[in-house]
Each structure stands twice: as C-alpha cells, then as structure tokens.
A protein has these predicted regions:
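Nucleotide/pyrophosphate-binding catalytic subdomain
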Residues: 1-259, 264
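Structural motif
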Residues: 1-2, 29-32, 71, 137-139, ...
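Short, glycine-/Ser/Thr-/acidic-enriched flexible segments
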Residues: 8-9, 37-38, 185-186, 201, ...
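Short helix/loop capping segments that flank catalytic or ligand/cofactor-binding pockets
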Residues: 42, 189-190, 228-229, 275-277, ...
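Flexible, glycine/charged-enriched surface loops at secondary-structure junctions
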Residues: 82-83, 259-262, 273-282, 335-347, ...
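A conserved active-site cap/scaffold subdomain adjacent to cofactor or substrate pockets
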Residues: 244-290, 295-316, 321
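A conserved regulatory-domain signal marking ACT and ACT-like small-molecule sensing domains
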Residues: 287-370, 376
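PLD/PLD-like phosphodiesterase catalytic module centered on the HKD motif
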Residues: 362, 367-435
Length: 435
C-alpha cells in the first residue's frame, strides 16, 4: 500500500482533478488523502465568522458562493448540468446547521470544526465520483469513522491504537483497492467532528501510512521538492534531494512550510519514507525523507511572520527561576498559545509566540480578562466579541513616552502609522504594543 496526499492547491479546479487521475493511473493498493479544494477552508471560516456574529444572511451568501465554485468544477468534469446528490446533501446539511442551530459560545470550537469539515467531505466526494466516472474504481472513506481523536477541537491528535482496527477493517472490507479519504478531520469518542489543525492533511496521510504499514507516503505539492528557502521570497532557493527525519521535524517546527510538524513521528516509528514531489511533473524525484539521509550541507532560511513577543516580569522584581516556568506554560497550554522561542534574563521571561491571542475564546469561557492598553482599543466588552467578563482600561495622553504604532489590515493591504513620538531610539527599541 502507498499513501498519496494532495493539497487544496493541486485540486483547485477541474484540471487539477484530472492531473490527480493522471498521477494515480496504474497504481494498485493506494490510499489517497485529499484536502478541501482551493481556498474552500478559508471560505468556510468566513461562513463560521458570520454564523458566530449572527449574520446568517451573509453566511448563506458565502455558502452559495462555495456551492457555485464546486458546481463549476463538477460541470467541467462531468459535463454541464450534472448534479452530484452527495454534494448537494452535504451543502444542504451545512445550510441547515447554520440556519437552525443557535450559536453557543461555550461550544465555539466544536461548531468551528463541524463547519470547516465540509470542505474535505465535498472535495473527496467529487474526486471519488470523478475517478469512478473516469474508470478508476475506488472506495470513498469517511475518515470521521476511522480516526478516533482527542476530545480537543481545532488541533486534535489521532489516537492511533484506537483508530487502527477501524481503518484496517474499512480497507479489508472493500473490493476496490484504491481509497479516497479526507485529510484534516476525525471524530472524538462522543462522535463530534474534530480537526487536526490547519494544514493537518499531511498528518492524516502519515497516520494512514502508519496504520496500513505503507511502503511509502508521497505529498504532491506545487514545488519541485523541499527547498532551502521560500522561492516566492528567495528566487535563488535550491532543492534539497534528501533529508533525515530529525532535520525535517526541526525545519517544520521552526516554520518551514514544507510539511505539517506532526507528520514525521508516525512515519519514523515504522521507518516509512516520505517523498515531496511536484504534482505538475509525475516523473520528478522530488525530495526523499527517511532515517538514513545525511545532514544538509547548504544553509536553510526560514522566514516566520506574524510573531508576537511577550515579556513577563514579577511585580517585586524577583529572579526568574525554573520553578515558575510550569505556571507560565500551563497557562499557555490552556489557551493553546504556541511558543517558538524562549529567553530569560534575571527578572524577565521573554516568549516568542504565534499571533493568536484567543482572547475571545477565553472571555467566552468565563475567564476574567483585564487589559491595560496604552492607546485605543477596538475590543468592546459586553458585545459578541468582548464579553462582560472583560475589563479594558485605555490610557491616552499626549505626554506618554513610547511610540504609538497603529496597524490596519486594510483588506489585505496593511497600513502602518506611527504617531506621538519623536525619533529617539528609546521610543522605538524593544517596545511591544497591544492594540
């Protein structure tokens, strides 16, 4: 058995689906994991945001856009005016959920997972039907019935031991020897849909490979293999022919957009090689990852965006000692704030984290939040976004010493302004503003 994984970019249109068929032609004993098509997960996140804020009309309009996008792919593949009953049923189920199930802030992450999972369910349904139509008999697998996960939404881990008999039974009971399943999703013990984290389809494929004792796993991407830098930023980036498991884990953890960080462990445990190959060139070797490759000899450059620096200091200026670390990290774990870099001095503990503060989720859970903000705050207590348990004090004064920096998203074209500051370095160096 081989395992192939195709990301959303590789199946974003009908030509991509046809190319998937071209790649798997001639393969027997193959398990294909597929992500949502194109930017469907982003679109479903918009649906959820509208649902969360009570704008059901906007949510329905976005669902209509998603339906039209997939119908255009279906028309291109099968011929105009062809409908797929399973796809229509999934879209109707999504519509009913958004319009009839009231939003519950205490179950926000569960509702999020249930919403975004429709992307993978729809994409695999279309692809499975198309492969059957094109002469490749296959068995569609609902991964929610075969992956048992933690009761943890948005970033669950798969319980491999509990999932193994379920997936093996599904495979053994099928006459077809090509299987199509969803990446990114599973279910908790209570049957609720869970997701494995954004870009978690790599991890899904690795778990499948582990359970089925696959001879190899291949991720088909829009690059020639793993490069030593992002070619969109560094045009001179070079392809790496071979990597070992340890280097790959370190690169993924450090932010290299090559593979999901949780992918390697299930493969390493059974010494299953991983290939990263270009979906535009079936014959290209790409990059091989296994336990035998030598250390990489060329420099690797990783640019990680949207990072935040937290500086923690005790009020009495007591030393930062190791016994205080568990308190800090238990809070970070509680709200799933991922830490990428740690540095401590005598009285400060500095943490570099992903810019995902999760204040709304914490407030919705009843956590009392007190913010002292130097400047203007747009988070309003007592609204959908700002709960009554939140207390905000904004300090505005013409004689405040620090620089004030204002960042506006501006529809994807950010604008940054600096105000009320002179150009003395003390006003700019080592300042972290919370807006």
């Amino acid at each position: 058995m081989k395992v192939y994984k195709f990301g959303g970019a590789s199946v974003k249109n009908a030509d991509g689906v046809r190319n998937l068929k071209h790649i798997i032609d001639g393969e027997n004993e193959l398990f294909v994991i597929v992500s949502a098509m194109g930017k469907t997960t982003n679109a479903l996140e918009e649906v959820f945001d509208h649902y969360r804020t009570g704008n059901i009309e906007a949510a329905q309009a976005k669902i209509d856009e998603i339906a039209a996008y997939h119908q255009a792919i279906i028309d291109d593949l099968f011929g105009e005016h062809r409908t797929l009953g399973q796809v229509e049923a999934l879209l109707s189920e999504l519509q009913r959920f958004i319009t009839t199930v009231p939003y519950d802030a205490s179950r926000a992450e569960e509702r999020y997972d249930r919403t975004v999972a429709f992307g993978e369910l729809i994409s695999t349904t279309i692809i499975s039907e198309w492969l059957n139509f094109a002469g490749i008999a296959n068995h569609w697998v609902d991964m929610r019935r075969t992956f048992v996960t933690q009761f943890r939404h948005k970033d669950a881990n798969v319980f491999i031991e509990e999932s193994t008999p379920l997936l093996r039974r599904e495979v053994a009971g099928s006459a077809e020897r090509v299987f199509v399943g969803q990446g990114f999703i599973g279910s908790a013990a209570d049957g609720s849909t869970t997701t494995l984290g954004r870009e978690g389809s790599d991890y899904s494929a690795a778990v499948v490979a582990h359970i089925l004792d696959a001879e190899s796993m291949t991720v088909w991407k829009d690059v020639d293999g793993i490069l030593n830098a992002d070619p969109k930023i560094f045009p001179e980036a070079e392809k790496i022919d071979a990597l070992n498991y340890v280097d790959t884990i370190e690169l993924a953890y450090s932010g290299a957009q090559i593979i999901h960080p949780k992918t390697i462990k299930p493969l390493q445990n059974k010494n299953i090689p991983l290939y990263v190959r270009p979906f535009g060139n079936k014959e290209a070797a790409g990059t091989r990852i296994d336990g035998n490759a030598e250390d990489v000899k060329i420099p690797i450059i990783i640019l990680k965006r949207n990072q935040s620096l937290l500086t923690l200091r005790s009020r009495d200026l007591s030393f930062v000692l190791e016994e205080k670390f568990p308190i800090v990290f238990s809070i970070l774990e509680r709200f799933r704030i991922k830490t990428n870099l740690i540095h401590n001095s005598a009285v400060d503990l500095n943490l570099c984290t992903e810019s995902s503060w999760r204040l709304e989720e914490a407030a919705a859970a009843g956590v009392k939040i007190s913010l002292n903000i130097r400047g203007i705050c747009c988070w309003v207590p007592g609204t959908v976004r700002g709960r009554a348990s939140t207390r905000i004090v904004s300090i505005v004064d013409r004689y405040l010493e620090h620089a004030r920096i204002f960042h506006f998203g501006n529809g994807g074209e950010p604008l940054v302004y600096i105000a009320s500051a002179d150009w003395m370095r003390r006003n700019l160096d080592r300042r972290v503003e919370l807006m």
